[in-house]
Amino acid sequence: MVHGRLCNRDGWILTAMVVTEFSNVGVNTLVKAATSKGLSPFVVLVYSYTFGSLLLLPLTFFSFRSRSLPPLTFSILCNMGILGLIASAFQILGYNGIKYSSPTLSSAMSNVNPAFTFILAVVFRMENISLGKKSSVAKVLGTILSIIGALVVTLYHGPMLMSSHSDWIIGGGLLALQYILVSVSYLVMAHTMGRYPSAVVVTLVHNVCIAVVCAFVSLLAEKDNPKAWVIRFDITLITVVATGILNSGYYVIHTWAVSHKGPVYLSMFKPLSILIAAVSTFIFLGESLYLGSVMGGILISIGFYMVLWGKAKEDKVDIIGAIESSPSHNAPLLDNFKS
């Protein structure tokens, strides 16, 4: 029964993570469209995360009433604040990177995320690696295959990525820095959720931090351009509303998933966004679908399922170990997996 509940939960996490990658590509496309119309990326962040915070307020209220949570101490708030500051930095880098380049390049650069997250998780002992175990070998090889697949999609038959245009280089550099910080944020997120296991509350504090930091940055960056704050009834308004909703939901799902599966599992879905972006541009924008996109997509899929298999194998071993080490095969196991 417990095993069935865990499998059902893992299925929901898997589905939710795939959906968030689709939404992430959509958000990046909207941000590119809005900034092309003259809307400042800093202002997009301020408005969207303020709107997202307002949406989360009633959910936070019900979260406090519906479950028993630990006291929200100053130390925990500082932990959430650090997470919010890191998120502010990578969001500013990311949205400006998209402004200088494109959503496709943003998806392409995300392939550095699994590698950095995996390395950092091993260094800080949040992920165990034993090359004598098939599960560990599968995770390592799956990570490498996914990154290779992402690079194939990006570089094979992709002359635009080799352009010497300065804006494209600036955009790529900003996006690379963004995904390095995203890797760091996953580890901080896992630590934060361990101390305060409420995805909604953590997301609310995260949103407020981004809105405040970006408001300060926007006042400095756009002090001579008051028109940058004007929201028109066109794609700019749609971008602010959609980004506020999707980014808040995206982060709630991420914090929930990282508390159950760890930061490496979370990062492994990033290469999927490249495949999603390639297919989306083919369907909606009429761009050519090259052999490199197909080959890279196959490699990403193989690597993705290898890591999932490795994680599932480890989870199964943990469950069996918990059963065998417990004098009672019911109560302790149930206590371990309450969420």
Curated annotation (Swiss-Prot):
Q: Which GO terms describe its cellular component?
A: membrane
UniProt keywords (A-Z) are: Membrane, Transmembrane, Transmembrane helix
**EamA domain boundaries:** 29-154
Q: What are the protein's GO molecular function terms? A: transmembrane transporter activity
- What Pfam family does this protein match (any one)? EamA
Which compartments does it reside in? Membrane
Q: How does it sit in the membrane?
A: Multi-pass membrane protein
Instruction: List all membrane-crossing ranges.
Output: 11-31, 42-62, 74-94, 104-124, 140-160, 168-188, 200-220, 233-253, 266-286, 289-309
Q: Which InterPro entries match?
A: EamA_dom, WAT1-related
Give the matching PANTHER family: WAT1-RELATED PROTEIN
- Family membership noted in the UniProt record: Belongs to the drug/metabolite transporter (DMT) superfamily. Plant drug/metabolite exporter (P-DME) (TC 2.A.7.4) family.
Name-wise, this protein is WAT1-related protein At5g40210
